[in-house]
Amino acid sequence: MSTINGCLTSISPSRTQLKNTSTLRPTFIANSRVNPSSSVPPSLIRNQPVFAAPAPIITPTLKEDMAYEEAIAALKKLLSEKGELENEAASKVAQITSELADGGTPSASYPVQRIKEGFIKFKKEKYEKNPALYGELSKGQAPKFMVFACSDSRVCPSHVLDFQPGEAFMVRNIANMVPVFDKDKYAGVGAAIEYAVLHLKVENIVVIGHSACGGIKGLMSFPDAGPTTTDFIEDWVKICLPAKHKVLAEHGNATFAEQCTHCEKEAVNVSLGNLLTYPFVRDGLVKKTLALQGGYYDFVNGSFELWGLEYGLSPSQSV
C-alpha cells in the first residue's frame, strides 16, 4: 500500500477479489482559506460556520458597565417587543438567580438545564418545522452514508457536512479508526459495519480524519512496543501503526507537527485498507453497490478534502 500526497494509490489485500489496479485518489477538494489576521471565522462547504455553537437565547446589546436598573429596563423592553421570549427569559433569570445564590459559581443544575434548553430549541426549530421528514423517519431509516469520524467535539459530521437526520449512519471513536476484521477484539466496530452494509444497504462508507487530532498525536508519541501507560488509548491508536511508520519513513526530517498532519491523512488510508478485510465490504465493492471514500477536515484553515477508492485510473477532479 502506497500514498501520494497523503492519498492511498494502491491496495493489494491478501483476501480480496478486487483487481490489483484499485486505487485511492483525490476526487474532490473544497477550500475556503482565510487570512490568519482576519477576524472573520473560516467557513466550510455550504458556507457553514466552522464551530456550530448554540446561538444564545437572549441577545440584547448591553454595555459592559450597564447598571442594574438599565439592564432590567433593557430586558423589559426586549420582552415587550418579543413576547415569545418570555418563557426562555424566565428560565435564564432563574438560572442566574440560582448561580448568584451559590456565590456566582455555575449551578449544579446547569447540565440538565443546558440539555433541556437544547432539546426545546431543536424541537421548535427543527422537529416541528419538518413534520414530513420526521414522519418518514418514524417508519425507519435508509441512510446512503456510513461515516467514521473522530470523537473530537470540534468535528461533528452533522455540522461540518450538513448531514440531516436519517442521512448518515455514524460511528465516532478516537482518531476515526477502523480496525481489521476481528470477531473477538473489535466486535463493536464490526457489528456497526455489518449492520450498515448488510441491513441498511448504505452506498458509501466515508472515513474522515481532521486537523489537530489528539489521537494521532498520541500515536506519533507513544512507543510502538513495551508497557503502556493507559488502559485503552495506546492499544487502540496502534491500529494505525502502519501510517506512523510510513510517515516517519517518508517525512523523517519534518517537524513533529508536520508529521502529525501527514499521519492524520495516512491513518485514514490505513482505515480504508482495513475495511477491505471485511468480507461483506469486499463483496459490496465487487458488486459495485458500495464505495469507499476518505476525507480530511482542516478546521484550522476551513477546508475539506475527499478521495475515493475506484477501479482503474481516471483523471482527478478538484473544485
UniProtKB/Swiss-Prot annotation:
An annotated GO BP: carbon utilization
Subcellular locations according to the entry: Plastid, Chloroplast stroma
Any one of the GO CC terms: chloroplast stroma
Protein name from the UniProt record: Carbonic anhydrase, chloroplastic
Transit peptide, from-to: 1-98
GO molecular function, one term: carbonate dehydratase activity
PANTHER family attached to this UniProt entry: BETA CARBONIC ANHYDRASE 2, CHLOROPLASTIC, CARBONIC ANHYDRASE
Protein species of origin: Spinacia oleracea
InterPro entries (UniProt xref): Beta_CA_cladeB, Carbonic_anhydrase, Carbonic_anhydrase_CS, Carbonic_anhydrase_sf
Gene3D superfamilies: Carbonic anhydrase (3.40.1050.10)
Entry EC number(s): 4.2.1.1
Family to which this protein belongs: Belongs to the beta-class carbonic anhydrase family.
Physiological role: Reversible hydration of carbon dioxide.
Catalytic reactions of this protein: hydrogencarbonate + H(+) = CO2 + H2O
Subunit and interaction comment: Homohexamer.
Domain of life: Eukaryota
Keyword Manganese: no
Keyword Lyase: yes
